[in-house]
Amino acid sequence: MSIQAPRGFNDILPGEQYGWRDSYRWQRLEEIFREVARLYGYQELRPPMVEYVDLFIHGVGATTDIVTKEMFNITPRGDDPDARRMAMRPEFTAGLVRAWLENGLYNNPQPTKIFAYGPAFRYENVQKGRFRGFHQLDVEVFGAQDPAVDAEVIKLGLDVVARLGLTGLVVSVNSIGCPQCRPRYRQALQDHFRPHLGELCEDCNTRFEKNPLRLLDCKRDADHPAQRTAPVTLDYLCDDCRRHWEGLLSHLAAMGIPYQIDTRIVRGLDYYTKTVFEVLHPKLGAQSALWGGGRYDGLIEIVGGKPTPGVGFGMGMERVLMVLEEEGLTAPFADRPRLDVFVATLGEAARPVGLKLLYALRDAGLSADIDYLGRSLKAQMKYAGKQNSRYVVILGEDEVRQGVASVKHMDEGTQESVPLDQIISHLRRAEA
């Protein structure tokens, strides 16, 4: 029987040979994200990976692909007193809103600026850059309407990837209006697409009545002539949305962020209002969006709170790491942690002394390891080299009798005898 990971799920593994799946690269990306988020004044919130389906039906949208096609639903046991259906989270924003409300974070000084990261799950058609189990870096701001905040979250994401050396990105922005001006735009879309319904896919026909903005998000009919001539949201914005839109563009220009206006961006979730954006990289082809987000001023009210503005983004970790690999950007991962000391022992008398030294090294804050397979000294040295150890402390029975050990500096190839009770201080001096 051959057991493999489910299709669309990936193992993240220790070792450079695994490319974008190298766990150290993931750790570095997470570290950089945390550092940048904290520089911007964001604090971490860790929501559960499972939420009630109702949260996504009402928050994300009952007609979205996520809810109708892509969620990994969980059916509780029959004897579960709380028998409502649950689902693995397909995205972060709705769960973070729920946590903000349930835990009364609105009572804290506002706005609330939070970040989160971790796995999410969608039953996708697996292809390059699109998986069923994927990971996101997420930031959200609750309680601020200022378009400067929209610009801030865009800049935050750009600062993260800039630390990784990633350039050549395209920031695409649009505004999809608000509940006051969107009805006119919805009507304009329906008037435009109605004569073409017989030529459009089944999904488009379903969306036509329930959420015509999603017609612009269709991948199957993206090249249909009616798509290219469809009305654009910017022509239907109310005065408030237009001021917000112009404010966003002004802030992006002031920050020196190049952008393009793409009126086809509507995002795939129903909660968006006003600003929507995507950051693209051409190396990913059809899945060129590394991250995207926007404003959702009605979501908190939909989930059960008071009317509260919000804005944020979700960045695909897999996609960022895949692009870094394709661009050959390995410098951010060059400072890979090394094993400080490998303790090589030879003979029964040396073994307990080596183990005692091993734990003393670790207690002193030095990473250390020892052979557990009974290998020869030559094999232990070879293994220490593969572990990229800085030093090897060699203990044989003669060294134990003399109260010393041989310390080999692996980078320099030098070796010297050091009293056992001075090993740690010797290594610290060597590193100074």
Swiss-Prot record:
GO molecular-function term, one example from the UniProt record: transferase activity
Reactions this protein catalyses: tRNA(His) + L-histidine + ATP = L-histidyl-tRNA(His) + AMP + diphosphate + H(+)
What domain of life does the native source organism fall in?
Bacteria
Which keywords does this chain's UniProt record carry?
Aminoacyl-tRNA synthetase, ATP-binding, Cytoplasm, Ligase, Nucleotide-binding, Protein biosynthesis
- Pfam families recorded for this chain? HGTP_anticodon (PF03129), tRNA-synt_His (PF13393)
**Where is the protein situated, by its record's location annotation?**
Cytoplasm
State which Enzyme Commission number(s) the record gives: 6.1.1.21
Record's Gene Ontology CC terms?
cytoplasm
Instruction: Kindly give the PROSITE patterns that the UniProt entry links to this protein.
Output: AA_TRNA_LIGASE_II (PS50862)
GO biological process, alphabetically ordered: histidyl-tRNA aminoacylation
Under the subunit heading, UniProt states: Homodimer.
Under the heading HAMAP family, the entry gives: His_tRNA_synth
Protein family per UniProt: Belongs to the class-II aminoacyl-tRNA synthetase family.
Q: What is this protein called?
A: Histidine--tRNA ligase
